């Protein structure tokens, strides 16, 4: 398998990997909020938004790659 064949597999893996972490981040943001750590919750929430943006970009890259 050459790199061109591997690339969509790798991108799909990255997306799935990120999504699995997002669930955990959401849980811990909630826990931080419950502990009264609103600043920490805000930082984690910001990280969630950044990772969601990253996933969106990776999905566009995958879509573009699959259209070729």
Predicted regions and their residues:
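N-terminal acidic leader/helix
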Residues: 1-29
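Short, charge-rich amphipathic interface segments used for partner binding and complex assembly
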Residues: 28-64
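Short acidic DE-rich linear segments
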Residues: 66-68
């Amino acid at each position: 398998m050459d790199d061109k064949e591997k690339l969509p597999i790798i991108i799909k893996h990255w997306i799935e990997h990120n999504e699995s972490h997002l669930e955990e981040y959401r849980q811990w943001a909630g826990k931080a909020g419950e502990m009264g750590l609103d600043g920490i919750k805000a930082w984690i929430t910001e990280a969630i938004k950044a990772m969601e943006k990253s996933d969106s970009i990776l999905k566009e890259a995958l879509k573009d790659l699959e259209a070729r």
